[in-house]
Amino acid sequence: MTFSLIRRGATGSAAVAALVVAVACQERGKDGKLLDTPTSGNIRVAVDETLRPIIAAHIDSFQGLYPAAKVRPTYAPEAEAIAGFMASDSVRDVVAARRLTTEEEAELQKQHIIPVQTRVAIDGVAVIVHPTNPDSLLSVAQLAELCAGKAPEWSRLNAENKLGTVTLVFDNSASSTRRYVRDSVLRGEALASTAFATKTNEELIEYVATHPGAIGFIGVNWISDEDDAAVRGFLKKVRVAALTTKRGGATPRDFVKPYQANVALWRIRQKAEQPYYPLCRELYVISREGRAGLGTGFASFVAGDKGQRIFLKAGLVPATVPVRLVQTADDRPAPAQ
């Protein structure tokens, strides 16, 4: 049984691609210097640190395809990445796990800039625990209790769990994962006062791997590509929790991990007949260019066929390349490419 989940034309990438093709020669600036083109030049882009593995793969592929193009990424927590994009026209694009706010759009319009916001993929927020933690099946309601500090001890969820104090860990105090948990899991409620942040995603994984009572939150793209040796190393150190949206009466089949197929089902969650992974978010490439420069070219690449297939191979859900789900013997949907 197959399901066609992703519709083409959802991001407007075709319009961006047409704009790129329309540029047949290099332009010159007022000073007479050659300007960058969609496939050549040297630019800076800001990238949410949570998305580093997948966007680094896109940059490598883009520069391999266009040797005259140099895309210099600055990886930073979401708040810093977007602030840098807003503050300087030297940062052409920002890659983030949200659209710009109405206030941010208005600020750019004061600068006579109309940002182009292109949806490129769906990522998830994975929940990781120590391998010895017996509670790796969690409902979203239980997760909210842990995040709010209402269940400060693991024994509050399971009397047989002797791991003691629950320690919430994020990759950065200004990261998109922390914001997502606050906005989408806690619905604006404050995080537990005991929550803390490491400096990097690698440090977060290492902390959870060495502290049995810890529970961490990390972008799925850090653990989704099992062809990557680093990812396989991470997965040997921690356990990825399976989640359900059910509040009571859940069976083991209702709990799902952030596999690509379960993230894809999130897109049709209103109609989905199977459990879907609940902690998902859409990724955007946002450009401030007023012409067809290298920033537009890179955004077009990420939203185009080659860029979308990079997301697909890495275990994320591309925005425009259709993903078919094939029912497997164990009744768990698997992506067919």
Where are these regions (language model features)?
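Bacterial N-terminal signal peptides that target proteins for export
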Residues: 2-14
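Bacterial N-terminal signal peptides
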Residues: 12-22
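Pocket-flanking alpha-helical
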Residues: 79-111, 223-228
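Peptidyl-prolyl cis-trans isomerase
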Residues: 112-115, 135-137
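Short, glycine-/small- and polar/acidic-enriched structural segments
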Residues: 113-120, 125
